[in-house]
């Protein structure tokens, strides 16, 4: 039976896959510096017979690996991340993704399913820092040759996301005029005053935005340490989020007016630099249901309904081009937060090793279902295009 064959393949690779995950955990690499993980993953895929392209989309640690069985048929995309957090190591579980994806890719390759199909593995670096998938898209890697894009991520429960928050990251700089705060205060124009008033304006704005909107900021440069100098420079970083891109664009426009108004009131100048823009996911319920069915088949731990409260991800931008989903597999206690000591402490546990194996099995079984059942795949693609059209129409 095909399902048993796929699971057996993953189990036979389990020791190598979990050892690889432990190795990545012990050698954490931040975004764009993931050279060890990159070489390990691409080398393994090459040995398995995949055609590997390194350094794609203008990113040294991005890759594409392709294996074809016959001509035509669906192209199953498997995407992985492998960057760590600066100062925290693999406290988000990215060390498990690559090994799980390789396990699924090898199982699907070795299965030699009767129908023609292609397996494409994408290595997508720097998710935590510069949202590498966005950079890849901007550099011409659209992922549109894929019929579906699948990911795995560790978490406190085995579940999928129904949605994600669209995000705009703003770098905000106020320029003022320095002056002696006691001798010539009238000559000064405080950049810090402008920034403080902007932050106060954002606080008042909270009352007048939809309930799902999140606005958070930090002052990264307060303009100096001498109280007797009117600050000529002040800088902040701000995230604005919403579950709907159209809604978010409207809120960001209002935030910009607040920032400009604060500059006007303090006779300072403001620079507003958009550093990052992430789209919300386009959910495909049929694909989510299919993935969760496979999770139940392999008896994955702590199976729960889809997450309703989520963060932001560059996978949302990919999901504007191709139907996709990410299965989260339990390896930390329920209630544990990502980017935490709990995630770090669990990184090399038996639960983490099991999550790699479960993730590989779930994605392998999902891929096989889509290869063997073209009607199921077409229904997923149809739902995706309908949901995408609704989203885009709401923006017009």
PLM region descriptions:
Residues 196-396:
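Metal-dependent amide/peptide-bond hydrolase catalytic core
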Residues 77-79, 175, 326-332:
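Non-cysteine beta-strand/loop elements that form the S-adenosyl-L-methionine
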Residues 27-31, 85, 181, 245, ...:
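Short strand->helix junction
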Residues 61-67, 83-91, 95-96, 102, ...:
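Histidine/acidic-residue-rich, glycine-tolerant segments that coordinate divalent metal ions
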Residues 2, 13-20, 33, 37-44, ...:
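General structural feature for long, well-ordered alpha-helical segments within catalytic domains
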Residues 2-118:
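Acidic/His- and Gly-rich active-site-bordering loop/insert found
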Residues 53-56, 121-123, 150-152, 304, ...:
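General beta-strand structural signal in soluble alpha/beta enzymes
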């Amino acid at each position: 039976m095909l399902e048993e064959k796929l699971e057996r393949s993953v189990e036979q690779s389990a020791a190598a896959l979990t050892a690889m995950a432990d190795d990545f955990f012990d050698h954490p690499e931040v975004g764009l510096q993931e050279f060890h993980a990159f070489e390990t993953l691409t080398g393994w895929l090459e040995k398995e017979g995949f055609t590997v392209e390194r350094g794609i989309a203008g990113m040294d640690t991005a890759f594409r690996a392709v294996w074809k069985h016959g001509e035509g048929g669906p192209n199953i995309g498997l995407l992985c991340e492998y960057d760590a957090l600066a100062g925290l190591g693999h406290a988000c579980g990215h060390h498990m993704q690559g090994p799980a994806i390789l396990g699924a890719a090898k199982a699907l390759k070795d299965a030699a399913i009767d129908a023609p199909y292609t397996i494409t593995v994408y290595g997508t670096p720097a998710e935590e820092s510069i949202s590498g998938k966005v950079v890849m898209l901007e550099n011409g890697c659209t992922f549109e040759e894929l019929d579906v894009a699948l990911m795995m991520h560790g978490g406190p429960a085995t579940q999928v996301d129904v949605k994600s928050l669209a995000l705009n990251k703003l770098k905000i700089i106020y320029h003022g005029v320095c002056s002696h705060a006691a001798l010539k205060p009238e000559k000064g124009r405080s950049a810090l005053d402008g920034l403080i008033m902007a932050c106060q304006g954002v606080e008042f704005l909270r009352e007048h935005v939809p309930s799902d909107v999140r606005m958070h900021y930090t002052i990264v440069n307060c303009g100096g340490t001498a109280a007797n100098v009117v600050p000529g420079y002040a800088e902040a970083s701000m995230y604005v989020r919403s579950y709907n891109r159209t809604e978010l664009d409207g809120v960001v426009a209002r935030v910009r007016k607040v920032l400009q108004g604060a500059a006007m009131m303090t006779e300072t100048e403001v620079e507003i630099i958009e550093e990052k823009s992430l789209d919300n996911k386009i959910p495909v319920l049929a694909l989510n249901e299919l993935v969760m069915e496979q999770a139940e088949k392999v008896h994955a731990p702590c199976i729960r309904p889809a997450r309703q409260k989520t963060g932001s991800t560059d996978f949302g931008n990919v999901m504007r081009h191709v139907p996709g989903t990410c299965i989260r597999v339990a390896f930390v206690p329920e209630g544990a937060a990502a980017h935490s000591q709990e995630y770090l402490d669990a990184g090399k546990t038996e639960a983490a090793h099991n999550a790699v194996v479960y993730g590989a099995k779930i994605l392998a079984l999902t891929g096989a279902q889509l290869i063997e059942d073209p009607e199921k795949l077409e229904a997923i693609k149809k739902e995706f295009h309908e949901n995408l059209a609704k989203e885009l129409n709401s923006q017009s």
